[in-house]
Swiss-Prot record:
EC class (word): transferase
Species lineage: Eukaryota, Viridiplantae, Streptophyta, Embryophyta, Tracheophyta
Organism the protein comes from: Arabidopsis thaliana (Mouse-ear cress)
GO cellular component: apoplast; cytoplasm; extracellular region; mitochondrion; plant-type cell wall; plasmodesma
Cleaved signal peptide residues: 1-24
Induction and repression of expression: By auxin and brassinolide.
Catalytic reaction(s) noted: breaks a beta-(1->4) bond in the backbone of a xyloglucan and transfers the xyloglucanyl segment on to O-4 of the non-reducing terminal glucose residue of an acceptor, which can be a xyloglucan or an oligosaccharide of xyloglucan
Binding positions for xyloglucan per the UniProt entry: 113, 126-128, 136-138, 202-203, 207, 282
Protein name in the entry: Xyloglucan endotransglucosylase/hydrolase protein 4
Keywords assigned: Apoplast, Cell wall, Cell wall biogenesis/degradation, Disulfide bond, Glycoprotein, Glycosidase, Hydrolase, Secreted, Signal, Transferase
Entry annotation: catalytic residues: 109 (nucleophile), 113 (proton donor)
Residues of this chain annotated as glycosylated in UniProt: 117
Tissue specificity comment: Predominantly expressed in young developing tissues. Expressed in 7 day old seedlings, roots, nodes bearing flowers, flower buds and siliques.
Length: 296
């Protein structure tokens, strides 16, 4: 796919057209809170900096180590959001991740992974979903903005019916509950939220051909928001005590509406560079869950 030389103009046109239509129902508005309300550092504490009373956090990667943090609680379903500004400049080999994951061998996982690139080349956003330890469900898109220039909002809506990935309230991917088709769906393993910044130059950029240029270090990823609105559960819990009664379980959040599907189609047509659902070399038979992905 060829990236437009004027993504800002395309985005302005898209938003102008959207404003003339009935707007989709987004998830509940995220509530920004300090880092320490919901999260704790997990490794390389000296490579993290907090500002403004913990309302902003920086993760720092150098040639010695990356760093990361995780949520205090574990959750079954909810809405999870973060404002992130990615490292700038030549970031080939550098990965910034924001994801949910359980901890056992047959784990569930819902991933945002931002793959760095050479200066002048667009960063790539990879999403993936693991169920029962099975992943290999990668989708990759170019973003329609420079994610290192300002904060943008990356969100996950997870309920019994679907998982939706949002960028600035625009849906970029859905993963539908296809249990009736024999596909496992994350519904009984509480997950923590994690974020990390690390060197992955063995695979992240052009399959590992582009290596991290440490002359450009340190690499800094910045965070704000730290929003969690989920059903908190113990790691041993198999169901959410409020299952079926929370706002994310209601009818309007069980599927995308027409406007959201239109926006998702725009992402597919203009910005998608890889979708495992359409990779017949890798998957000669379409994976069963892709039958629920109406835009595949």
């Amino acid at each position: 796919m060829t990236v437009s030389s004027s993504p800002w103009a395309l985005m302005a046109l898209f938003l102008m057209v959207s404003s003339t239509m009935v707007m989709a129902i987004p998830p509940r508005k995220a509530i920004d809170v300090p880092f320490g309300r919901n999260y704790v550092p997990t490794w390389a504490f000296d490579h993290q900096k907090q500002f403004n009373g913990g309302s902003e956090l920086q993760l720092i990667l150098d040639k010695y180590t990356g760093t990361g943090f995780q949520s205090k609680g574990s959750y079954l379903f909810g809405h999870f959001s973060m404002h992130i500004k990615l490292p700038a400049g030549d970031t080939a080999g550098v990965v910034t991740a924001f994801y949910l994951s359980s901890t056992n061998n047959e784990h569930d996982e819902i991933d945002f992974e931002f793959l760095g690139n050479r200066t002048g080349q667009p960063a790539i956003l990879q999403t993936n979903v693991f169920t029962g330890g099975k992943g290999n469900r990668e989708q990759r898109i170019y973003l329609w903005f420079d994610p290192s220039k300002a904060y943008h909002t990356y969100s996950i809506l997870w309920n019994m019916y679907q998982i939706v990935f949002f960028v600035d309230n625009i849906p970029i991917r859905t993963f539908k509950n296809a249990k009736d088709l024999g596909v496992r769906f994350p519904f009984n393993q509480p997950m923590k939220l994690y974020s990390s910044l690390w060197n992955a130059d063995d695979w992240a950029t052009r399959g590992g051909l582009e290596k991290t240029n440490w002359a450009n270090a340190p690499f800094v990823a910045s965070y704000k928001g730290f929003h969690i609105d989920g059903c908190q559960a113990s790691v041993e819990a198999k169901y959410c005590a409020t299952q079926g009664r929370m706002w994310w379980d209601q009818k309007e959040f069980r599927d995308l509406d027409a406007e959201q599907w239109r926006r998702l189609k725009w992402v597919r047509m203009k910005w998608t560079i890889y979708n495992y659902c359409t990779d017949r070399t890798r998957f000669p038979v379409m994976p069963a869950e892709c039958k629920r992905d109406r835009d595949a």
